[in-house]
C-alpha cells in the first residue's frame, strides 16, 4: 500500500490540504474531519481523470490501494487543539510565549523546526499527564 503525504495548514478561517501526486491536489474546509473527506474525494477524482488523460498512474493507486498520511503544520495542529488546550498550558510546557503561540495558531507566523518540535513534544507531554490520571 502506498502512503500519500498530505500537508495540512490553517489560514483565513479554513484548513487546507495539499498533496503533490501527478500534479497537485488541493482541498479546503472549515472542519478538519470534513476536510479529510473532501480531500479524499478530490484525490480520487484527480487520479481517475489523470488516468483518462493517459497519465501514467500505477495500478495499485488506480485500484485504491493507498492511504493518506496527514502532516499538520503548526497552524492546523494548534487550531485543532484551540479551545481544548489553553495557550497558557501549552506555553507552560513548551516555554513559548502565549502571544507567539497565538501567531502560530492564526498562521501569522511559521515556527522554526525547533519550535515546532517543542510544541509537538509539549502536546505529547500534556497527553501523558492526562493518561496518568487514575
Predicted segments with their positions:
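Short, charged, surface-exposed hinge/linker loops at domain edges
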Residues: 1-3, 41-99, 103-109, 114, ...
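DNA-binding alpha-helical recognition surfaces that contact promoter or target DNA
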Residues: 37, 103, 121
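Hydrophobic micro-packing sites on short alpha-helices
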Residues: 116-120
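DNA-contacting interfaces and partner/effector-binding or oligomerization modules
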Residues: 1-55, 59
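Residue cluster at the C-terminal edge of the helix-turn-helix DNA-binding motif
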Residues: 122-129
Amino acid at each position: 500500500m502506498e502512503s500519500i503525504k498530505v500537508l495540512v495548514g490553517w489560514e483565513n478561517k479554513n484548513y487546507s490540504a495539499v498533496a503533490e501526486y501527478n500534479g497537485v491536489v488541493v482541498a479546503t474546509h472549515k472542519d478538519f474531519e470534513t476536510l479529510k473527506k473532501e480531500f479524499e474525494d478530490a484525490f480520487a477524482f484527480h487520479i481517475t481523470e489523470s488516468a483518462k488523460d493517459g497519465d501514467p498512474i500505477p495500478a495499485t493507486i488506480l485500484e485504491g490501494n493507498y492511504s493518506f498520511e496527514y502532516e499538520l503544520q503548526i497552524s492546523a495542529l494548534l487550531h485543532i487543539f484551540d479551545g481544548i488546550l489553553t495557550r497558557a498550558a501549552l506555553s507552560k510546557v513548551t516555554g513559548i510565549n502565549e502571544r507567539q503561540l497565538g501567531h502560530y495558531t492564526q498562521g501569522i507566523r511559521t515556527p522554526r523546526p525547533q519550535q515546532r518540535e517543542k510544541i509537538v513534544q509539549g502536546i505529547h507531554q500534556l497527553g501523558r499527564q492526562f493518561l496518568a490520571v487514575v
